[in-house]
């Protein structure tokens, strides 16, 4: 069995969870998982029904775009996923969906301010807008890359959908559910009163610093995993020469 199998299986597991919760529909959206210690990731194929997806359907690509495994065409957003992994060592799972409430804000071109401490703790100081660009283009990839450096884990893609990041599959799914909950609450507040108050600044900063601490620990773990893998490969090469 290929050592990429666990990552491919995890992509399918995440897709099924999101499908069951109504965050994914038919072939919309995409999901990817970083392969530990490598510049490689597993990503959903393009235009393939999630209800029929199996591990063998998942594409395995290098960050440079080279195909490693999989016969199907990779998601048109694959390069966007690769860019996130290259820029954020703490991110191990990426989810892009067109889920209804958060996507409604994408159509309104409205970011979500810091409404709840839990939101800031896991998603960041705010859910920022990523300027519109056509799906699957280098323009969208560049727009996303410009936004993710601040440590936030959720973004609204103008006139498109949402992008959520996580250090694990469980955290990414949690972040997606939290984003949809916050988006619904925000929409209701705007509908009823036309406004929504932010959580107090000191609380926001405490919550955000906890998030940043988690991200630094994840980045450190990723660096250690890469170093261990490179050392193992070096030992293997040395053994071959002996």
Give each language-model segment a name.
Residues 1-242:
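Glycine-rich flexible loops
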């Amino acid at each position: 069995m290929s050592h990429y199998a666990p990552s491919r299986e995890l992509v399918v597991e995440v897709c099924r969870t999101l499908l069951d919760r109504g965050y994914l529909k038919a072939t919309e959206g995409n999901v990817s998982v970083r392969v530990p210690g490598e510049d490689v990731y597993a990503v959903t194929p393009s235009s393939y029904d999630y209800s029929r997806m199996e591990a063998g359907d998942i594409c395995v690509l290098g960050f440079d775009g080279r195909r490693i495994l999989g016969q199907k065409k990779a998601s048109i957003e694959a390069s966007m996923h690769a860019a996130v992994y290259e820029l954020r060592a703490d991110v191990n799972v990426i989810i892009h969906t067109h889920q209804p409430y958060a996507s409604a804000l994408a159509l309104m071109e409205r970011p979500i301010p810091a409404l709840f401490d839990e939101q800031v703790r896991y998603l960041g100081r705010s859910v920022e807008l990523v300027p519109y660009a056509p799906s699957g283009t280098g323009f969208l990839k560049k727009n996303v890359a410009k936004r993710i450096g601040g440590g936030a884990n959720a973004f609204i893609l103008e006139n498109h959908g949402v992008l959520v990041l996580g250090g694990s599959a469980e955290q990414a799914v949690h972040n997606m559910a939290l984003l949809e909950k916050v988006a619904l609450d925000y929409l209701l507040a705007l509908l009823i009163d036309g406004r929504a108050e932010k959580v107090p600044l000191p609380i926001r900063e405490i919550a955000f610093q906890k998030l940043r601490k988690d991200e630094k620990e994840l980045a450190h773990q990723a660096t250690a995993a890469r170093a261990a893998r490179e050392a193992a490969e070096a030992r293997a090469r040395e053994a071959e020469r002996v």
